């Protein structure tokens, strides 16, 4: 599930690191004996752990809700990335939908990571609406590269917002 063609190589590498919990969140930097005040750059409420940032943060949750609503599914988010990867592929059904569905976690995670780094290193913050649109645009771009999405479906995504 980690290595996906038509997704940039650096994003595939990032996803692989994420599945190994090796992405340099503040929690992982602290494990290397650096003194930090660990706080999520998105919600500014909780410690920045891999599981919080990429699954449970209220900002990230908005992205998970968009895509789960498109599939009309209700789900309980797993506790960690490994559990998510184990259950995610069981939700898809047809071939094209399955392929589109499989890139959703990577799209969400990459959007979250880009926003986090923009806030951390550049001091720039997108509002929630732009954050969601960045994710949807990225998803559409990746699907379009693989001819997995039609224009009508993009409008369905935007209508949700």
Please provide the spans of the model-predicted regions.
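Short, solvent-exposed helix-loop connector elements
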Residues: 1-5, 89-99, 117-125
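Acidic, Ser/Thr-rich intrinsically disordered and amphipathic helical segments
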Residues: 10, 14, 24, 49, ...
């Amino acid at each position: 599930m980690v290595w996906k063609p038509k997704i940039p190589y650096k994003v595939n590498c990032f996803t692989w690191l994420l599945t190994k919990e090796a992405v340099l969140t503040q929690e992982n930097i602290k494990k290397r004996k650096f003194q930090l005040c660990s706080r999520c750059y998105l919600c500014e409420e909780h410690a920045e752990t891999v599981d919080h940032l990429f699954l449970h943060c209220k900002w990230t949750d908005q992205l998970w809700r968009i895509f789960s609503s498109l599939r009309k599914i209700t789900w309980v988010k797993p506790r960690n990335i490994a559990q998510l990867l184990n259950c995610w592929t069981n939700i898809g059904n047809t071939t094209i939908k399955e392929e589109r569905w499989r890139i959703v976690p990577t799209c969400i995670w990459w959007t979250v990571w880009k926003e986090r780094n923009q806030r951390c290193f550049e001091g720039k913050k997108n509002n929630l609406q732009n954050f969601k649109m960045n994710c949807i645009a990225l998803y559409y771009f990746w699907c379009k590269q693989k001819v997995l999405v039609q224009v009508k479906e993009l409008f369905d995504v935007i209508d949700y917002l």
